[in-house]
Amino acid sequence: MSAPEKPRERSFPKIEFTDSEAGAKVFPSSKSRSFSYFTPAKLRATMYEDVTVDVQPDPDRHLTQGWIYGFGNGPGGYPKDWTTAKSSNWHAFLDPNEEWNQTIYRNNAAVVRQVELCLKNAKRARVYDGWHTIWLTFIERHVGAWMHAENGLALHVFTSIQRSGPTNMINTAVAVNAAHKMRFAQDLALFNLDLAEATDAFDGSVHRAVWQEAPEWQPTRRVVEELTAVGDWCQLLFATNIVFEQLVGSLFRSELIMQIAARNGDYITPTIVGTGEHDYDRDLNYSRNLFRLLTRDPEHGEANKALFAEWLGIWVPRCLDAARALQPIWSTPADKAVTFASSLKAAKAKFSALLEEIDLDIPEELDK
């Protein structure tokens, strides 16, 4: 009887390190527990910088072989020629508000709770029963009409260009701007529905006809529609946040509604409109920084100033025409706390101060 065969020993290939594994390469800060590909604005990077800077790389930063994605018959990635404005370093822009995905939901949720609580308290206290019919007519016609302007800017201006900028920091700021406008338009719509349910004296559907047919609103509607036809994302941002919002938006919201509502026994509308004004103040903050960066650019600053002057020549006359067409609205309320002349003067003064802050000359059209 033959002896049983011994089991064969299994062999394993010898492990060889090729220095291709993670952590093999040694370089400055390679042993650090944290490493950043960018230089933060301050001593340490903020959460905003960690989640926005270099999230959208380009051939100027890290993509040494060019864009790795793009349409088959078009340019790759995010071309810089999507605007005629120039910058020696688009990545230098950082949103002073430090807005990113989390702050969009957190800040908007806080505003939504504020508006809901305001409307709920108004209905419980039956506030609308004490409002004069003239003031209800003013709200249904003009505040309702402004809702269409906000909605148009949200959907067809800011949403349309939120992926057109050359850096993630610019695109994130514009996306937050779109969220602000969209939420404010929805707040005005909710306010309109609440009033329509609370009192029979309020017509909740007339705002559409006012926006489409009322002569005082047609120049404003025309400007909003002309804005949606602009293909240059930087011009669209400039014309909207720097020109239109100053000469028309703030004129209506801040210099009219916020001034006269309380005198007409209304403390609800200023609360809601005030959220839109607060949003615009934040949006203006990033817009001011962006255009100041472009006008002070060491290589393209003078060319950008000339370009922005051309844009002012296009949009200032249109927005002034829209502003002056709104003049009859100032005589509508029962208690006329302010005049159109004083409101327009205040809006022009703020606009002039803004232009000085971004190193631009005051256009001649502003004094005509």
From Swiss-Prot:
The organism's place on the tree of life at top rank: Bacteria
Pfam families: Phenol_Hydrox
Oxidoreductase found in the keyword field: yes
Upregulation: By acetone. Transcriptionally activated by MimR.
Keyword annotations: Monooxygenase, NAD, Oxidoreductase
Quaternary structure (record): The propane 2-monooxygenase multicomponent enzyme system is composed of an electron transfer component and a monooxygenase component interacting with the effector protein MimD. The electron transfer component is composed of a reductase (MimB), and the monooxygenase component is formed by a large subunit (MimA) and a small subunit (MimC). Requires the presence of the chaperonin-like protein MimG to ensure a productive folding, resulting of a soluble MimC, which leads to the active form of MimABCD.
Protein name: Propane 2-monooxygenase, hydroxylase component small subunit
UniProt gene name: mimC
